[in-house]
Design a protein with these regions (language model features):
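Helix-to-loop junction immediately C-terminal to a conserved catalytic motif
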Residues: 52
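The feature captures the beta-strand-to-loop junction immediately N-terminal to the Walker
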Residues: 37-39
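Conserved ABC ATPase "signature" region
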Residues: 114-132
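Catalytic Walker B motif of ABC-type/P-loop ATPase nucleotide-binding domains
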Residues: 161-164
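Conserved ABC ATPase signature
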Residues: 136-140, 144
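Conserved ABC transporter NBD signature motif
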Residues: 60-70, 78
Length: 281
């Protein structure tokens, strides 16, 4: 199966001198859930912007949905297929009513009003924000605002959604809500690319790529990637809390196995203690 997004030897420098991307190669398959991890300055957000032609590499190539970002005539079409959700939802709010904000993109495409209404209704339902359709976006929580931003992208009917640090400004509850939306969209068949520095965000992924200094330095499933604790720490990243806790327990002689998922670790501990994890007794 050909890649839905194909990045080949991509190089890019903002000032024409200091490269941010150093020959990156990445293929993203249709319907996959991909997480790109990295500390600030690793190049992950720049890479994300190449996926919908907001940035065109100085060298190498990027194709999305069989369209080339190097062709100016195809760049707008790429952005219809590949939507982006950014870190600060306030920067994507353009009206004083939630439903109107979601409708803004389709209206600019000249779509018929009846179709816009249908898309807005479906998009708000997909992010569990239907009851806020007539609300003022400025009165919503950070997590709710981000879900409205996602709805605005969904109303454009993209094939791929790229999330660039969408949870960076949210509290844990808001982060969980946005992650639930991303999982739900992926379960419906949409390709999800999540750019993040939160380790727990990567647990939902099919594939995780770790970036450092403009290169992808590690790839694999979440469990495969998080098994490289020493490498992650050298890159300024940490293993998920559950895996760090498992290591600490083993150091104290408690026989648990590595897992990045807290519920799995809780089940192991309960089993060792002779406790029914579901009943708590």
């Amino acid at each position: 199966m050909p890649a839905q997004i194909d990045i080949a030897d991509a190089r890019f420098a903002y000032d024409g001198e200091h490269e941010v991307l150093h020959g990156v190669n990445l293929q993203i398959e249709e319907g996959s859930y991909v997480v790109i991890l990295g500390h600030n300055g690793s190049g992950k957000s720049t890479l994300a912007r190449t996926m919908n032609a907001l940035i065109v590499p100085d060298e190498g190539s990027v194709s999305a949905c069989d369209l080339s970002s190097a062709d100016p005539d195809e760049q707008i079409e790429i952005r219809r297929h590949v939507g982006m959700v950014f870190q600060n939802p306030d920067n994507q709010m353009v009206t004083s009513i939630v439903a109107d904000d979601v409708a803004f993109g389709p209206e600019n495409l000249g779509i018929a009003q009846s179709e816009i209404v249908r898309r807005v209704d479906e998009a708000l339902e997909a992010v569990a924000m239907t009851e806020y359709a007539q609300a003022d976006p400025t009165e919503l929580s950070g997590g709710q605002k981000q879900r409205v931003s996602i709805a605005g992208m969904l109303a454009m009917n993209p094939d791929v959604l790229v999330f660039d640090e969408p949870c960076a400004m949210l509290d844990p509850r808001g982060r969980r809500g946005v992650r639930r939306v991303m999982r739900s969209l992926n379960e419906r068949g949409m390709t999800i690319v999540h750019i993040t520095h939160f380790m727990e965000d990567a647990l939902d992924a099919d594939v995780v790529h770790v970036m450092d200094k403009g290169n992808i330095v590690l790839s694999g499933t979440p469990d495969e990637v998080f098994a490289h604790g020493d490498l992650l720490r050298s890159l300024g990243l940490e293993q998920p809390f559950a895996m760090r806790l498992a290591h600490a327990l083993r150091a104290r002689g408690i026989d648990v196995t590595d897992t990045a998922r807290l519920p799995e670790l809780e089940e192991q501990i309960c089993r060792l203690a002779g406790i029914d994890a579901e009943k708590g007794e």
